[in-house]
Regions:
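Positively charged n-region of N-terminal signal peptides that target proteins for export
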Residues: 1-4
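Long luminal/extracellular ectodomains of secretory-pathway precursor proteins
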Residues: 20-179
Length: 179
């Protein structure tokens, strides 16, 4: 009789564990994905009239924060140079231009979660993104006869089913939000 009771108890625990595992799997499987959408613009003043125009054909990357460490190092390098009170402005500008060019070359080589390109209206979209973590969004484009465009934003932790909308500006410095 004690063996029968022990056997039935063991089977009951095993059945309960299987039921819990099935319930947990069902709950985990139903977490809706998040999405990140945005629009990239540039503010311009032409003949004393301020306008906003979309930034077309900007390559936009979505990264997990841990994969952007080399980019963050380039941001920090430029920020440290700008923070020096007795720094030579020309030398600081040159150092930041080099870091910007390196960032432009680096970003496409980093492992991205997703990529997109802005359309004619400057919009982009990342769908079916895993929630529960923050992301880094970095947009790059070769500059016409000048420095490349590098736009950076850090998202908050995405919630399940969240649809995050971003308004990005080419006018923001690439060293802006330190990642």
């Amino acid at each position: 009789m004690p063996k029968l009771f022990a056997c039935l108890s063991w089977l009951g625990m095993l059945g309960g564990a299987a039921l819990f595992a099935g319930q947990a799997k069902r709950l985990v499987g139903e977490v809706p994905p998040a999405s990140v959408r945005g629009r990239v613009i540039v503010f311009e003043t032409i003949n004393r009239k301020a306008t906003t125009n979309p930034v077309r054909d900007l390559q936009v990357y979505l990264f997990k924060p841990e994969t952007t460490k080399p980019f963050v190092e380039l941001q920090s390098k430029c920020r440290r140079a700008m923070a020096q009170p007795k720094a030579d402005p020309v030398q600081t500008y040159h150092l930041c231009e080099i870091a910007l060019a390196e960032a432009f070359e680096l970003v496409p080589t980093l492992p991205a979660v997703a990529t997109a390109k802005t359309g004619a209206d400057g919009s982009f979209s990342f769908e079916n993104i895993a929630p529960g973590r923050p992301y880094h969004v970095i947009g790059i484009k070769a500059g016409k006869g000048g420095s490349p465009i590098v736009i950076v934003v850090k998202t908050a932790r995405l919630r399940p089913g969240q649809q995050l909308s971003l308004e990005l500006s080419e006018n923001e410095p690439w060293t802006g939000p330190i990642m």
